[in-house]
Structure formats: structure tokens, C-alpha cells
Amino acid sequence: MGKLEKNVFVIWITTFTTMLGVGFIAPIMAIYAQTLGATNLEIGLIFGSFALARTVAQIPVGVLSDIYGKKFFIVCGTFFYGVSTLMYNFVSTVLGFLIVRIFTGIFSAFVTPVAGSYIAAIAPKTRLGEYMGIFNSAITLGFGIGPFIGGILADMYGIKMPFYFCGFLGILAAIISYMKLEDIVFNKNKEKIDVKKISTLFSFEFLKNRNFSSSFIINVSNVMINAGIYAYLALYAINYNITISQVGFMIALTNILMALLQRSFGKLYDKLGNIMIIIGIFIISFGMYLLSTSTTFLTILASLTIIAVGSSISSTATTSLAVKDIPTHRKGEAMGLFTTSINIGMFIGAVSFGFLADILGIANMYKFSAIFSIVVGIISYLRIER
């Protein structure tokens, strides 16, 4: 195994291990918050605080990782994410839970954006799509199978056990990256960093780049669609006598499918280029329309499978396009900003599509999502520089 492959493998293992832990606690967060006396509004604040903290932190973290090295932030992020996750088991109030949630959001910003920029920096430019597909598969696969394992742990050993396992996996990921990962630093003259340079930590100048901004908007749209699916799929499926365990199976299966497909679609992007983005968007929209008309386990599963294929195509292509023309020494900053599209999409999608579901019903909300995806996708695609 060469040096490039070794570093990619270490990043993949570190990211997968961390996201596996995140998946462990995903099914039980709301239940655990309720045992502390949290209302539905407070549960919403708890979930939202993670995305908000992550969004605020990941842009400056991306810039600082370019200056001071990727390894430091990946090691610190995974370690303190693990430690802060362990603290869930020792909180006794909703406020304490909220504070811990904020810290886990901050430290999660040290991991995936920095790891993604690490891959973008070391990957050969002609194989960027392939390597970003490999990286994205670690996120999707880890979070895909994590909820199943976390649910089993909670049923067998109590609701606190997944938090212990998640914390352990975070610390394990820190140890792996500390021992095996090679550091990369782009600015070794740290003493020359001045106030003007620090002021660029929150720079949004990348959004002036049409390719970056188009990728950003498309990714927000795609994540909004996925947020609408995952937030309301169980409510939709229960109307057709589909059990929660079957819903969990469908989500896990589609996530694993996405993980398996992303590298191959990354290679296709390297060959075919930006046309892959619009192909993925049309497939997503077709799957969303089918989902809105599905009334059985098999038809819903088929719809989600189609959406997963489209998402695999589109997500790998948009991520690759976003960082393709960014200077190597600023890919961390760009990746940090680009990854905020995930948090923005999750928040806006869950809230806005929930509002529409109350007015139109969940099935019609899914139909609206299909139209929304196509309209936003086409407009953004036409803005991409040829």
C-alpha cells in the first residue's frame, strides 16, 4: 500500500468510526431527552443546536487546518467528540443536555470537513471524484448501519449504552489518526499570520465562484429533500401498516447502497463531468414522485432505492465540482464552507417541508419536493461554468 492509499485508508477508517458512533445515538436522542423532561420544542432546540454549532465552527476550523495542519484538528476533534459524547450519560437537566449537544456539534466540525479537505488536497486532480466518493462512502456507511446497532444496544443494555459506545469509538478514531495519519500543512510560517489573515476565517468569497455556489445550492436542495424524507417517512409509512423497524431497515439499506455506489459514480464524474449532476437530480425527483404514490413496503423501498442512486450521483459530483478549482492551500476553508450546506439543508428541509406536510399532507409534500428539486437543480446547473 502506497503513502497515498495509506492516508486515504486512515481517513476512511477515522471518518467511518466517528460516523458509526454518531449513528449509534441517532435513534435514542429524542427518547433520552424526554426522560430528562424535555418538551418537543426543547427537543427541537437540542437537535438544532448541533447543526448551528457545527455550522459556526467548521468554517474557521477549515481555515485553521490549512494553516496549522489537518492532523491536529482531526485528532483533537475525534477525541473531544468522544469525550463530550460520554458526558451525555452524566447530565441530569435539559440545559445540561443542550450544552453537551453544542460541544459535540463544535467538535464534529473538526472531523468531517477537515477530513474531506485532506482527501481533496492529496487526491490526484484527475481522480478527485473517485477519492471524494470513497470519502463520502465512509460517512454514509457509518451513519447507515449505526442506528441499527445503536437500537440493539439500547434494547439490550439500556438507553445509555449507545452513548458509551459512541464515546469509545470517537476516542478510538483519535488514537488511529494520531498513530497512522501523516500530517499536511500548507502555511508553515505561522508567525506571519496577522489580524487581516484571521479576519478571513469567516470569508464567504468562495460563493462568488459560480461553480462553488451552484454546487452549494444544489447540495442544500438535495439535503432538504433527504431531511424531508427521514423526518416524516415513519409518519407516512405507518399509515400503510409499515412498522418502525421496517422503516429503519429501509433507511439503513438505502444508506449502505449510497456508500457502495459513490466511488463508482465518482469515477463516472471524472469521465463525464458535470452532466452527472443534472442526471442525479432528475433521478432523485423521479424517486420522490414515486414515493408520494407508494403505499406498500416494497414500493416505498423501491422509491427510496431510486432516490439513493440519484443522491449518490449528485452528491459526489457536486462535492467534486465545489473544490475542483480551489487552490490546494485553501481547500480546507472551501470544504468547511461547503459542508455548511448540509446543516442548512437539514434545518430548512425539516422545518419547511414539515410546514407543507401540515397543509398539503405528506404525500403531496413529497410531490412538491420532487418539483422543487428539479427547479432548483436546473437553475443552479445552468449557472455552472462550462
Swiss-Prot record:
It is found in: Cell membrane. It comes from the Archaea. The keyword RNA-binding does not apply. Keywords: Cell membrane, Membrane, Transmembrane, Transmembrane helix, Transport. The keyword rRNA processing does not apply. Its main location: membrane. InterPro entries: MFS, MFS_dom, MFS_MdtG_subfamily, MFS_trans_sf, Tet-R_TetA/multi-R_MdtG-like. It is a multi-pass membrane protein. Belongs to the major facilitator superfamily. This is Uncharacterized MFS-type transporter MJ1560.
